[in-house]
Regions:
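Ubiquitin-like/PB1-type beta-grasp interaction modules and other compact soluble beta-rich domains
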Residues: 1-77
Length: 78
């Protein structure tokens, strides 16, 4: 087993839409959505069984090990 170096961010294990994912420690929800190329204006995020209604808070919400996210996309149509 290796220990991460002090200058390397630790990886955190998450579950996203039922699939295992990992992110660097300190990653915000906003940064995670950007890494997936998702526009926060067209998704709804459930974080640990709680729907996040305040999209402004995405930038300050740091993800933690064990977090469970469900991300739902809005799809237009007619």
């Amino acid at each position: 087993m290796t220990t991460p170096l002090a200058h390397e961010p630790s990886a955190l294990a998450l579950t996203v839409n039922g699939d295992p994912r990992s992110v660097a420690a300190g990653t915000t929800l906003s940064a995670f959505l950007a890494s997936l190329k998702l526009d926060p204006r067209v998704v709804v995020v459930e974080h640990n069984r709680e729907i996040l209604r305040d999209r402004e808070a995405y930038g300050s919400l740091e993800l933690s090990a064990g977090d469970v996210l469900e991300i739902v996309h809005f799809v237009g149509g007619g």
